[in-house]
Amino acid sequence: MRNIRVLVFGATGTGKTSLCNTLTGRKRPTDNGARGITAKSHLYPAFQTDDCRIEIIDTVGLHESSQGTVPAEQAVVELIDLLEKARDGFSLLVQVTRASRITKEHDEDYKFFVEKMTQGNIPVILAVTGCENEYPMTSWVDRNQEAFSRFAYKELVPTCFASGGPMEEFFAPLRLQSREPLLGSIIHNALVEPRKLYGTGTSSSFNQSLTRIWNEFVAVTAYPYTQVMLHKLNAYVPL
């Protein structure tokens, strides 16, 4: 059976946790507030489809430390946690964005996860949420494909993963309608085997990867190094 490990990332409020819940059949809490709710990266239990075993990791938002969900001093702990969950590598990255203009946060998320953390070695697709007002939903991608041409996305997948509220009867079938093509894109675009970011068979150790990723995190979020952060980085020894 083919093993596919997927890292899902995106700015606060893009619907990545709702997307992960729908793909996995789980019910992790979601929040539409500005502060978000993904304060810690979460590894969902693996599920099977089409002779594939799929594991999904929902990441803490890159900008949530500055927006109140994750204190700055805890950010390094969350990066360590994410890197530990990356021990077995990834087969695919899924960036989640709303059906709107390309934001600064979108660019920074892409640079951090695609170019820096995984160094362009793992394919990435874009899941576009909020397409429920389009008919068909693919029309948004048709109109906006060119705007995303500067990114190395293998595919843009229009989706609706909204849930709850008075429109739930409208959202529910659209979530199911979105799940099948997104899963198909994941299976089609994922590497045959997960690719490791560090350790045996790579040119990087855990601590080298952590230092490189942390430096980029600081550059993107403009956090100053604090003594607490430096102590956590310097004292950490991977298991």
Describe every region a protein language model picked out.
Residues 1-239:
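Conserved GTPase G-domain substructure that encodes guanine base recognition and part of the catalytic core
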